[in-house]
A protein has these predicted regions:
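Short loop/turn motifs that connect adjacent beta-strands in outer-membrane beta-barrel proteins
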Residues: 20-28, 56-65, 91-97, 153-159, ...
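C-terminal outer-membrane beta-barrel translocator/porin domains of Gram-negative envelope proteins
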Residues: 222-343, 359-361, 366-368, 373-382, ...
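Transmembrane beta-barrel strands of outer-membrane/channel proteins
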Residues: 36-38, 48-52, 68-74, 84-86, ...
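Outer-membrane beta-barrel initiation region
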Residues: 20-98, 180-182, 186-225, 339, ...
Length: 452
């Protein structure tokens, strides 16, 4: 509600503000915001977040010397976010250094199985009913990242290197609305059938090493109007932090991000974001599948594939596999620019179209055993129908999922961007005999920044 009131005040200011030249910001600049949202499964989110920018004498504006982002919030049914991020282009001469320390206490999070369309999605099971939450599990993540970047000569190319430590705690969902005596979930089903081995069923610790190259000709990183950005990097984790497992969870992955921006007149920018992230070698644990590794972290949560940080309008983490392809396309249309409370403001909207799919499956052979090696039995009921273990492997190969939507952005000094985005999935599974395969209704995101 506070965000909506603030937005209304900004809209009112637009009506009375005269056209003024953008001022060059100097020194410290603060962007506080209440963290408020609602989820039927998680409850109300309450807390606060703050962006701090240091512009120095203003000669680098709209770029910054350094920034800090912090957030502390909690949901009424138990989930919590504690986040601190630092990014500096001046702390060490010739280097860009960023650090992230975050705790995501996801005592209730979505789990829809592996390999997209291969895993049955039942809309009536996608909620807590009578103490049962079939598509829920727990996934806490304590994360620390340290990244360094440097230029290669005077070219637009650069190198990037970093480490990322993640400590995952997984298990059955913890939620006040669940009946702990009778609740049975898809996560439990996967553990019982060995699709998720017991040795990784409760989480683990991993130290990822990142190394790659970057190409960047954008005129501005956070709010570009033109240019190209390419990121290509390897990241992997040797499994030496998880004791004596009977097998190893070493893995090596490749991520490639391509971003392109074209100006279409003075007020419209077309942006495209094409991504591949996939396994090259090894055996990634199930709890790491939804971890999307960025170089420069624009959002606290970058999990996928699905939901607001990767594939808007779909159910969160709907697509999980060994390798993904996805793309985001949008038109960023500036509605108004004005000065208010000695800050540079802009209002923008961004109609968007997203698509993605699993291109290399994960533990598909094990999924085929659902209801086969053990006596098939009902594991869930919804809409007057019983669903058996064997129902949750459809035998389908994943195909392209699509969504579209619209956003409204309130941007201060070209960096602090309050985002309201609404998306709808188009993948209804009509060919497969069920509807709303990626979630029903309108997905909503209230947060910071464009997603790319």
């Amino acid at each position: 509600m506070k965000r909506l009131i603030s937005l209304a005040l900004l809209l009112a200011a637009v009506c009375s503000a005269s056209a003024q030249e953008e001022i060059r910001k100097t020194g410290l600049n603060f962007g506080p915001l209440p963290a408020v949202s609602y989820s039927s499964d998680l409850g109300f989110q309450y807390g606060a977040l703050l962006d701090i920018y240091q512009y120095g004498d203003g000669t680098v504006y709209p770029d910054y010397l350094w920034k800090i982002n912090v957030e502390a919030s909690r949901y009424t049914k138990g989930n919590s976010v504690l986040h601190a991020y630092f990014d500096s282009k001046s702390l060490i001469r010739g280097l860009r250094v960023s650090a992230d320390l975050t705790y995501l206490g996801n005592k209730t999070t979505n789990f829809y199985g592996f390999n997209g369309a291969a895993s049955l999605f039942v809309p009536d099971l996608n909620k807590i009913v009578d103490g049962h939450g079939f598509y829920l599990m727990r996934r806490d993540d304590l994360r620390f990242e340290l990244t360094a970047q440097g230029r290669i000569g005077s070219s637009h190319w650069g190198w990037v290197a970093g480490i990322a430590f993640n400590s995952y705690k997984t298990g059955h969902a913890v939620n006040k609305s669940l009946d702990i005596n009778s609740d049975y979930s898809l996560y439990d089903l996967y553990v019982n059938y060995g699709i998720i081995p017991v040795e990784e069923a409760y989480g683990g610790n991993h130290l990822d090493i990142k190394l790659g190259v970057v190409f960047d000709t954008r005129d501005h990183e956070n709010n570009p109007t033109r240019g190209t950005n390419i990121e290509a990097f390897l990241f992997g984790s040797p499994d030496f932090l998880n004791g004596k497992r009977t097998y190893r969870n070493d893995y090596l992955k490749l991520a490639i991000h391509f971003r392109q921006f074209f100006p279409l007149g003075d007020r419209v920018v077309f942006g495209a974001h094409l991504v591949f992230q996939g396994l090259l070698a090894g055996n990634a644990p199930f709890y790491s599948l939804q971890t999307i590794q960025p170089i420069n972290r624009k959002n606290v949560i970058t999990d996928g594939l699905g939901s607001y940080s990767t594939f808007r309008g779909t159910a969160a983490n709907r697509l999980q596999g060994n390798s993904y392809l996805w793309a985001n396309f949008e038109f960023r249309c500036t509605l108004a620019k004005f000065r208010w409370i000695n800050q540079n403001w802009a209002l923008a909207t961004n109609p968007f179209f997203d698509m993605g799919m699993v291109v290399v499956p994960y533990r598909l052979e094990q999924m085929k055993g659902l209801g086969q090696d053990l006596k098939d039995f009902p594991v869930a009921s919804a809409g007057g129908k019983d669903y058996f273990a064997s129902d949750f492997y459809t035998g389908r190969t994943d195909r392209l999922h699509t969504s579209a939507g619209l956003g409204l952005h309130v941007i201060m000094n070209q960096n602090f961007n309050i985002a309201f985005e609404f998306g709808k999935s188009f993948f209804d599974g009509y060919r497969f005999g069920w509807k709303n395969n990626d979630g029903s209704g309108i997905g909503m995101r209230i947060g910071l920044n464009y997603i790319f």
